[in-house]
UniProtKB/Swiss-Prot annotation:
Domain of life the protein comes from: Eukaryota
Methyltransferase in keyword set: no
GO biological process per UniProt: ribosomal large subunit assembly; translation
NCBIfam families reported for this sequence: rplT_bact
Protein family membership: Belongs to the bacterial ribosomal protein bL20 family.
Protein name: Large ribosomal subunit protein bL20c
Purpose of the protein: Binds directly to 23S ribosomal RNA and is necessary for the in vitro assembly process of the 50S ribosomal subunit. It is not involved in the protein synthesizing functions of that subunit.
Gene from which this protein is expressed: rpl20
InterPro entries documented for this protein: Ribosomal_bL20, RIBOSOMAL_L20_CS, Ribosomal_protein_bL20_C
Disulfide-bond pairs as recorded: none
Length: 117
């Protein structure tokens, strides 16, 4: 009876795994089992941090807006600013407001003066 050699599917899967894990350090880029485990961990971390990145950027925008607003007046806080924006029905999100705060502070000053009571 002739010998039947194994197929290429497992080798192709491991090659793909090696390409993914080639930048990992130590045994994590050399041994198949640890490569598999590290790949799972990397994908879990990537999934988790995609959500975390959204929260981090929102926090950064809020901090930037708050810093610029505190320069205008001592008693004018961020939450009051956002509340007045919604009351006046100005559709500016936090990302745009943070960019305005960085690049064009005078424009943000005029916006805050317009929406003050």
């Amino acid at each position: 009876m002739t010998r039947i050699k194994r197929g290429y599917i497992a080798r192709r899967r491991r090659t793909k795994l090696r390409l993914f894990a080639s930048s990992f350090r130590g045994a994590h880029s050399r041994l198949t089992r640890t490569m598999t485990q590290q790949r799972i961990r990397a994908l879990v971390s990537a999934h988790r941090d995609r959500g975390k990145r959204k929260r981090d950027f929102r926090r950064l925008w809020i901090t930037r807006i708050n810093a610029v607003i505190h320069e205008t007046g001592v008693f004018y806080s961020y939450n009051r600013f956002i509340h007045n924006l919604y009351k006046k029905q100005l559709l500016l999100n936090r990302k745009i407001l943070a960019q305005i705060a960085l690049l064009n502070r005078s424009c943000l000053y005029t916006i805050s003066n317009e929406i003050k009571n």
